[in-house]
Design a protein with these regions (language model features):
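A glycine-rich (often HGG/GG-containing) alpha/beta subdomain
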Residues: 1-142, 146, 150
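C-terminal-of-GTPase-core extension/linker across diverse P-loop GTPases
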Residues: 2-9, 13, 141-186
Length: 186
């Protein structure tokens, strides 16, 4: 659906042990391959590969790279996550290298937007992701996780099905009012 590949820092940008940089899109594997010491082309989905981010043959950081192949990913696109050391400098440098090699900086919420537009999650689940990020207590987090699991959709599904049947019947009556075998709507 999308013809570009996006990248962003997925963890808070602060000094810490680990930072994660996420890349999603058709060219995710190719772009990460351009800066990674190992070839991900033939690696299995949901695998982790140890290696180095390199620039001009010199190591930039020691990393673990997680590979998730479409469609079994959050965005339903190929997704690669680089787990690097958590300093702000090295995290930004790796992101910059990805952008220089063809990725585009993701907008805030764009990974979830792609998950929604690619049919991975529905609107209530997309909203719940933000609710989870903003949750400040157990009750709010619990409500958000139930929404992410699709409990609202499951609750509403019988009503949605009934409405879809009603719409179909109305459309048949509009399109074929002269046929006797079509149940008349009043």
């Amino acid at each position: 659906m999308f013809d570009d590949t996006i990248a962003a820092i997925a963890t808070p940008l602060a000094d810490g042990a680990i930072s994660i940089i996420r890349v999603s899109g058709e060219q995710a594997v190719e772009i990460v391959n351009s800066i990674f010491s190992k070839d991900l082309t033939h690696k299995q989905s949901h695998s982790i590969t140890y290696g180095f981010i390199q620039q001009d043959g010199a190591p930039v950081d020691e990393v673990l790279v997680s590979l998730f192949r479409a469609p079994k990913t959050y965005t339903r696109e190929d997704v690669v996550e680089i787990n690097c050391h958590g300093g702000q400098f090295v995290t930004r440098k790796i992101l910059r290298m990805l952008l220089e090699n063809g990725a585009r900086l993701a907008r805030a919420g764009e990974f979830t937007e792609r998950a929604f537009l690619n049919g991975r999650i529905d609107l209530s689940q997309a909203e719940a992701v933000q609710d989870m990020v903003e949750a400040s207590n157990d009750q709010a987090a619990g409500m958000a996780v139930r929404q992410i699991k699709g409990s609202i959709r499951k609750l509403l599904q019988p009503l949605i099905d009934s409405l879809m049947d009603l719409i179909a019947a109305i459309e048949v009556n509009i399109d074929y009012p002269e046929y006797d075998d079509v149940e008349e709507m009043t």
